[in-house]
């Protein structure tokens, strides 16, 4: 069962994540961070960047692996996840760009029709993560349908990094990054699988707003099912889910989650 932390707002969630990762980097200067895009992690990255600056933490050895990338977008496209990770993580934290990887880096706009090249990219990415020693902390968002990364409902809970077709709901949700034009949103992606994600030593999932309440309810208190990919976190030995009041609104046991976190010894961290 993941630890559930209910916070007032995204800034408070960001501070919890930022302190967790900053302490990790201090203890392990070559830490491997799992990175996600979307709006949910932004406050977390901002909080971490502030701590790194305020405490003069050396991040020169930190490595990173992103969750996913669109198929068909060149790396220079402003909404490619290569560009997004560089803009929201690499630059603010001062990471070495050569040590931060995105699954589509070797594809760089390769069209979907080039199946031979695309098919090899997923297994190669999993091998690169393993060669780095695995992910220490993986940050995650969650879709309104319970997807994590681009693992849509119905994805295998044992899957590795591979090419997937984006669900229509995901394309609708992501159209806000493409001038609200769904026709600009790619139809395919390459994503870490649930099996790959579950190998990370610590998972931290963030969710905010009433629109995520049903997905959080299914993730935390529903059954483990491929039709809610995030529900796999119930099986992880060290998973933390940080939500605001609106995202937690459908949780039946939220009073217990608050009680447990309030009485948790500080030395345990998250």
UniProtKB/Swiss-Prot annotation:
One Gene Ontology term from the biological process aspect of the record: N-acetylneuraminate catabolic process
EC number: 3.5.99.6
Key words, A-Z: Carbohydrate metabolism, Hydrolase
Annotated InterPro entries: Glc/Gal-6P_isomerase, Glucosamine6P_isomerase, Glucosamine6P_isomerase_CS, NagB/RpiA_transferase-like
Pathway: Amino-sugar metabolism; N-acetylneuraminate degradation; D-fructose 6-phosphate from N-acetylneuraminate: step 5/5
One Pfam family here: Glucosamine_iso
Catalytic residue positions: 68 (proton acceptor), 145 (for ring-opening step), 147 (proton acceptor), 152 (for ring-opening step)
Domain of life: Bacteria
Record's catalysed reaction(s): alpha-D-glucosamine 6-phosphate + H2O = beta-D-fructose 6-phosphate + NH4(+)
Single GO MF descriptor: glucosamine-6-phosphate deaminase activity
GO CC aspect terms: cytoplasm
Entry keyword Hydrolase: yes
Gene3D superfamilies: 3.40.50.1360
Family annotation (PROSITE patterns): GLC_GALNAC_ISOMERASE
NCBIfam families to which the protein is assigned, alphabetical: nagB (TIGR00502), PRK00443.1-4 (NF001684)
Family per record: Belongs to the glucosamine/galactosamine-6-phosphate isomerase family. NagB subfamily.
PANTHER family tied to this protein: GLUCOSAMINE-6-PHOSPHATE ISOMERASE
Record's function text: Catalyzes the reversible isomerization-deamination of glucosamine 6-phosphate (GlcN6P) to form fructose 6-phosphate (Fru6P) and ammonium ion.
Record protein name field: Glucosamine-6-phosphate deaminase
Lineage: Bacteria, Bacillati, Actinomycetota, Actinomycetes, Bifidobacteriales
Gene encoding the protein: nagB
